[in-house]
Regions:
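C-terminal ends of transmembrane helices
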Residues: 22-35, 57-59, 82-95, 140-151, ...
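N-terminal topogenic module of multi-pass integral membrane proteins
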Residues: 1-51, 55-61
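Cytoplasmic-side transmembrane-helix entry/capping segments in multi-pass membrane proteins
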Residues: 37-46, 69-75, 95-106, 130, ...
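Intrinsically disordered, low-complexity non-transmembrane regions of multi-pass membrane transporters
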Residues: 1-7, 203-228
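Small-residue-rich segments of transmembrane alpha-helices in multi-pass membrane proteins
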Residues: 45-52, 77, 102-115, 133, ...
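Structural signature of hydrophobic alpha-helical transmembrane segments
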Residues: 6-18, 65-79, 123-136
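Loop-to-transmembrane alpha-helix initiation sites
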Residues: 13-14, 70-74, 123-129, 155-163, ...
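Helix-coil boundary and interhelical linker segments in multi-pass alpha-helical membrane proteins
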Residues: 1-10, 59-68, 113-126, 171-183
Length: 228
């Protein structure tokens, strides 16, 4: 008899999809590029943000796409994107709320990805990898769709690092016998806290060329000038 397929509770998955949809629409509504997005464009970005993480997660795990197994996923993502568009003006003035929303979305998708990978029998390291990909996948697709540089590839407040820390906490906790649900909650909290602190205190990984400068300075006693 085949082992039962691990299923994330529908309400939990839809919560992540909805929050991601709102966050994507808020981002797209505030976009000020050479070509402004119309209502359809903003809605598409919201849907991509809401559903992207789950799609990437299930593709990596070679599982049926959860987002295509129910009408509720697309409906939730679309409705959330519309809410994000309608409330874009008031919510953009609440920067702390947007940062918190972003942190929770990353944490949820990371926790769901890692939990599902562990439940399907993946070892710790691959499970954490799946979780991180699920956490940042929506943001990557958003940037690709909007023709922007992929944010996680550039210097900025900790994003993938926060997701990795939360996913690792989840995986290690479960390894030591903590129930998967409790471990997932801990993972979401860790991811959200690190992400918020990174934004508040402007924390980021060092730039590669800064490491080069320090190495040369240590070896020669001089500070090289590196042109951008």
């Amino acid at each position: 008899v085949d082992a039962p397929i691990f299923v994330i509770p529908l309400w939990a998955d839809l919560t992540a999809v909805g929050l991601g949809g709102i966050q994507g629409a808020l981002f797209a509504s505030g976009f000020r590029g050479q070509r402004r997005l119309d209502l359809l464009g903003v809605a598409i970005i919201g849907i991509v943000m809401g559903m992207g993480g789950g799609i990437i997660r299930d593709m990596l795990l070679n599982q049926p796409l959860s987002t295509l197994q129910s009408n509720w996923y697309l409906l939730t993502a679309t409705l959330a994107a519309l809410v994000g568009m309608l409330l874009a003006g008031p919510l953009r003035r609440l920067n702390g709320l947007i940062v918190g929303l972003d942190a929770v979305v990353i944490g949820l998708f990371g926790a769901f990805g890692t939990s599902k990978a562990l439940a399907l029998g993946l070892p710790l390291v691959p499970a954490v990898f799946v979780g991180v990909c699920a956490a940042v996948g929506g943001g990557i697709l958003r940037d690709v769709f909007m023709g922007l540089p992929v944010a996680i590839m550039h210097v900025g407040s900790l994003y993938a690092v926060a997701a990795a820390a939360g996913c690792l906490v989840l995986g290690v906790s479960n390894l030591f016998g903590v129930p998967l649900v409790a471990a997932a909650v801990a993972g979401v909290i860790v991811t959200a806290v690190i992400r918020v602190l990174a934004v508040v205190f402007d924390l980021s990984l060092p730039e590669q060329r800064m490491l080069y400068r320090r190495k040369v300075a240590a070896e020669t006693g001089t500070l090289p000038i590196v042109k951008p």
